[in-house]
């Protein structure tokens, strides 16, 4: 009795046997989803928009200024977070029943930190792409220079070979 390692392919694979000769034999892929959709019970949207803290029900701890100094605000929130964690340690030692308020404040600070960091992601992605493209340009220039150098070496070797052959 022989057993197969893999199960047999589904019967509809025969519908696409001539795909290499005729690309129209396969059905077109479904169009991309636009708007909202449900996946594993969660509602998602295809729009890449960062919801505001107010929409999420979180108080905003930094100014709503359009010219926000991200570095300054991140440092400020980080210092505030450190202070609240130390206060939480004091509360847990002295008044353990009041820890819930401190946990809520720490959670709010973390959410503000993450919101600020997430708002920087498009800038970081753009800077990363610029860096990658600059590296690619540099590598291509280096490759061109390497090809030119090797071509000159090959031409020199050919000239030497012609001189040697002509001298004999």
Curated annotation (Swiss-Prot):
Component of the Mediator complex. Interacts with MEE14/CBP1. One of its GO terms (molecular function) is transcription coregulator activity. SUPFAM superfamilies: Mediator hinge subcomplex-like (SSF140718). Keywords: Coiled coil, Nucleus, Transcription, Transcription regulation. Residues 1-33 are annotated as: Disordered. GO terms for cellular component: mediator complex. Residues 64-92, 132-162 form a coiled coil. This is Mediator of RNA polymerase II transcription subunit 7b. It is found in: Nucleus. Residues 1-12 have a biased composition (Pro residues). It comes from Arabidopsis thaliana (Mouse-ear cress). PANTHER family: MEDIATOR OF RNA POLYMERASE II TRANSCRIPTION SUBUNIT 7 (PTHR21428:SF11). Belongs to the Mediator complex subunit 7 family. InterPro entries: Med7/Med21-like, Mediatior_Med7, Mediatior_Med7_sf. The gene is MED7B. Component of the Mediator complex, a coactivator involved in the regulated transcription of nearly all RNA polymerase II-dependent genes. Mediator functions as a bridge to convey information from gene-specific regulatory proteins to the basal RNA polymerase II transcription machinery. The Mediator complex, having a compact conformation in its free form, is recruited to promoters by direct interactions with regulatory proteins and serves for the assembly of a functional pre-initiation complex with RNA polymerase II and the general transcription factors. One of its GO terms (biological process) is de-etiolation.
């Amino acid at each position: 009795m022989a057993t197969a390692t893999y199960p047999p392919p589904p019967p509809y694979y025969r519908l696409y046997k001539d795909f290499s000769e005729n690309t129209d034999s396969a059905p077109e892929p479904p169009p991309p989803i636009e708007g909202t959709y449900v996946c594993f019970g969660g509602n998602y949207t295809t729009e890449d928009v960062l919801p505001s803290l107010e929409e999420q029900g979180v108080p905003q701890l930094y100014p709503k200024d359009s010219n926000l100094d991200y570095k300054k605000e991140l440092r400020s929130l980080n210092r505030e977070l450190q202070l609240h964690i130390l206060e939480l340690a004091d509360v847990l030692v002295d008044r353990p029943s009041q820890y819930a308020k401190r946990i809520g404040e720490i959670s709010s600070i973390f959410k503000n930190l993450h919101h600020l960091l997430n708002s920087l992601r498009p800038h970081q992605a753009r800077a990363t792409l610029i860096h990658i493209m600059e590296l690619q340009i540099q590598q291509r220039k280096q490759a061109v220079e390497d090809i030119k150098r090797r071509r000159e070496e090959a031409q020199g070797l050919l000239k030497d070979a012609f001189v040697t052959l002509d001298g004999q």
